[in-house]
Design a protein with these regions (language model features):
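Amphipathic, interaction-prone secondary-structure segments
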Residues: 14-52
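Mixed-charge, Lys/Arg-enriched low-complexity segments
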Residues: 59-96
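Intrinsically disordered, low-complexity regulatory segments enriched in Ser/Thr/Pro
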Residues: 39-72
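N-terminal non-cleavable signal-anchor helices
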Residues: 10-11, 21, 50, 71, ...
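N-terminal cationic amphipathic segment used for targeting or macromolecule association
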Residues: 4, 27, 36, 74-75, ...
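Short linear sequence elements within intrinsically disordered, low-complexity coil regions
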Residues: 24-27, 32, 55, 64, ...
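Short acidic, Pro/Gly- and aromatic-enriched capping/linker segments at domain boundaries
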Residues: 1-19
Length: 96
Protein backbone atom coordinates (compact mmCIF):
# COMPACT_ATOMS: atom_id res chain seq x y z
CA UNK A 1 0.00 0.00 0.00
CA UNK A 2 1.33 3.39 -1.01
CA UNK A 3 1.54 5.97 1.83
CA UNK A 4 1.00 3.45 4.61
CA UNK A 5 0.93 -0.14 5.72
CA UNK A 6 -1.96 -2.33 4.61
CA UNK A 7 -2.14 -3.93 8.06
CA UNK A 8 -2.59 -0.48 9.66
CA UNK A 9 -5.33 0.35 7.15
CA UNK A 10 -7.15 -2.84 8.16
CA UNK A 11 -6.66 -2.11 11.87
CA UNK A 12 -8.16 1.37 11.47
CA UNK A 13 -11.34 -0.09 9.95
CA UNK A 14 -12.31 -1.15 13.46
CA UNK A 15 -12.63 2.43 14.68
CA UNK A 16 -12.05 5.03 11.94
CA UNK A 17 -12.84 6.05 8.37
CA UNK A 18 -10.26 5.59 5.61
CA UNK A 19 -9.80 6.82 2.05
CA UNK A 20 -7.86 5.12 -0.75
CA UNK A 21 -7.18 5.71 -4.41
CA UNK A 22 -7.35 2.61 -6.57
CA UNK A 23 -6.90 2.77 -10.34
CA UNK A 24 -7.66 6.49 -10.37
CA UNK A 25 -10.86 6.23 -8.34
CA UNK A 26 -11.37 7.37 -4.75
CA UNK A 27 -12.93 5.06 -2.17
CA UNK A 28 -14.26 5.76 1.31
CA UNK A 29 -14.27 2.97 3.90
CA UNK A 30 -16.74 3.84 6.62
CA UNK A 31 -15.20 2.35 9.78
CA UNK A 32 -17.19 -0.24 11.71
CA UNK A 33 -20.43 1.23 13.07
CA UNK A 34 -22.02 -0.56 16.05
CA UNK A 35 -25.74 -0.73 16.76
CA UNK A 36 -26.39 -1.10 20.48
CA UNK A 37 -29.35 -2.15 22.59
CA UNK A 38 -30.83 0.08 25.28
CA UNK A 39 -28.55 -1.54 27.87
CA UNK A 40 -25.43 -0.87 25.76
CA UNK A 41 -24.85 -4.33 24.33
CA UNK A 42 -23.75 -4.54 20.70
CA UNK A 43 -26.55 -5.90 18.54
CA UNK A 44 -24.79 -5.68 15.18
CA UNK A 45 -21.88 -4.02 13.40
CA UNK A 46 -21.88 -2.58 9.87
CA UNK A 47 -18.97 -1.84 7.55
CA UNK A 48 -19.41 -0.13 4.18
CA UNK A 49 -17.15 0.97 1.33
CA UNK A 50 -18.17 3.57 -1.24
CA UNK A 51 -16.65 4.46 -4.59
CA UNK A 52 -16.75 8.24 -4.36
CA UNK A 53 -15.84 8.67 -8.02
CA UNK A 54 -18.90 6.77 -9.27
CA UNK A 55 -21.03 7.50 -6.17
CA UNK A 56 -21.79 3.82 -5.57
CA UNK A 57 -21.70 1.45 -2.61
CA UNK A 58 -19.26 -1.33 -3.49
CA UNK A 59 -19.38 -3.21 -0.18
CA UNK A 60 -21.83 -3.37 2.70
CA UNK A 61 -22.03 -5.99 5.41
CA UNK A 62 -23.72 -6.32 8.79
CA UNK A 63 -22.40 -8.94 11.19
CA UNK A 64 -22.50 -9.68 14.93
CA UNK A 65 -18.95 -8.34 15.44
CA UNK A 66 -16.36 -5.97 14.01
CA UNK A 67 -13.96 -8.87 13.47
CA UNK A 68 -16.47 -10.60 11.20
CA UNK A 69 -17.11 -7.38 9.26
CA UNK A 70 -13.42 -6.79 8.62
CA UNK A 71 -12.86 -10.43 7.62
CA UNK A 72 -15.71 -10.14 5.12
CA UNK A 73 -14.16 -6.96 3.74
CA UNK A 74 -10.79 -8.69 3.32
CA UNK A 75 -12.44 -11.55 1.40
CA UNK A 76 -14.68 -9.41 -0.84
CA UNK A 77 -13.49 -9.20 -4.45
CA UNK A 78 -14.39 -5.51 -4.85
CA UNK A 79 -11.08 -4.25 -6.25
CA UNK A 80 -11.45 -5.05 -9.97
CA UNK A 81 -12.26 -8.64 -9.04
CA UNK A 82 -9.46 -8.91 -6.48
CA UNK A 83 -9.58 -9.24 -2.70
CA UNK A 84 -7.99 -6.58 -0.50
CA UNK A 85 -4.71 -8.42 0.09
CA UNK A 86 -4.37 -9.11 -3.65
CA UNK A 87 -4.95 -5.44 -4.57
CA UNK A 88 -3.47 -3.47 -1.66
CA UNK A 89 -0.14 -2.96 -3.43
CA UNK A 90 -2.02 -0.88 -6.05
CA UNK A 91 -3.84 1.27 -3.46
CA UNK A 92 -2.78 4.66 -2.20
CA UNK A 93 -3.91 5.59 1.31
CA UNK A 94 -4.97 9.24 1.21
CA UNK A 95 -6.52 11.89 3.44
CA UNK A 96 -10.09 12.88 2.70
Amino acid sequence: MINGKASEFIDKLYYADNYVLFHGEKYFANGCQSRKSADGKIISVRLEVYNLTSDTTVFSVTKPSSIECVRSFEEAAIWDGKKFWEAECQMQWVDD
